[in-house]
């Protein structure tokens, strides 16, 4: 069954202590901490915003890189939001912007080369609206070396048109990927698996597509209710 690691869905079968993870939009490094604690894998945390980046705790399993993931290399304006998780390359972030700074941007092929893993076991993307351009600009030969992707698309809050998300997913499907939308509204939590790099059957994929979103939704509600009871 699929598993949620700090609000991002992954398949645990394809992660181990030998795995390499690339975390784009690492913020304060909580996903990196959670994924390495769960699997003992190595994770490269990529974050452009200075304050969250400085707070990411490096370890033998976690390394960090200060950069924005973008379609191409260069210096780009980055919008610092009041809520740090909403900071973005896009000016259309729904959260109030408190500052705009210039940051280094690297493309996915460049980030992939710096990590050096072939294949990459997991790519996590949470880059506040820049994910469509990032994926669409990446050569198929690079994407096809990624075993699974967990991505937060931003059609749920209006930053990205739903049609663009569907178009990007359709292209990934043509490359041999299969996707499961885990969120009720939009593609806030989407899990994507490379069928060519994973021994996963069509029957299992259909089961996960039909059952996993509901089952994991029930678990999320149960956890929230337990927290409320514990706080009462």
Locations of the language-model features?
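Phosphate/nucleotide-binding beta-alpha loop and adjacent structural elements of enzyme active sites
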Residues: 1-232
């Amino acid at each position: 069954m699929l598993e949620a690691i700090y609000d991002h869905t992954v398949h645990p079968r394809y992660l181990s202590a030998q795995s390499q993870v690339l975390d784009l939009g690492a913020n304060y490094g909580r996903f990196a901490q959670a994924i390495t604690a769960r699997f003992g894998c190595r994770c490269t945390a990529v974050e452009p915003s200075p304050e969250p980046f400085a707070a990411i705790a490096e370890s033998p399993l976690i390394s960090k890189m200060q950069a924005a993931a973008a379609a191409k290399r260069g210096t780009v304006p980055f919008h610092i939001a009041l809520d740090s998780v909403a900071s973005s390359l896009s000016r259309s972030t729904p959260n109030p912007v408190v500052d705009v700074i210039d940051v280094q941007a690297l493309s996915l092929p460049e980030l992939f080369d710096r990590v050096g893993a072939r294949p990459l076991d997991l790519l996590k993307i949470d880059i506040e609206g820049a994910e469509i351009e990032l994926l669409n600009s990446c050569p198929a030969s690079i994407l096809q070396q990624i075993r699974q992707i967990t991505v937060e698309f931003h059609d749920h809050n209006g930053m990205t048109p739903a049609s663009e998300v569907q178009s990007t997913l359709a292209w990934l499907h043509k490359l041999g990927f299969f996707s499961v939308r885990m969120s009720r509204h939009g593609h806030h939590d989407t899990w994507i698996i490379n069928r060519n790099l994973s021994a996963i059957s069509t029957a299992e994929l259909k089961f996960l597509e039909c059952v996993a979103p509901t089952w994991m939704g029930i678990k999320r509600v149960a956890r929230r209710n337990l927290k409320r009871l514990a706080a009462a």
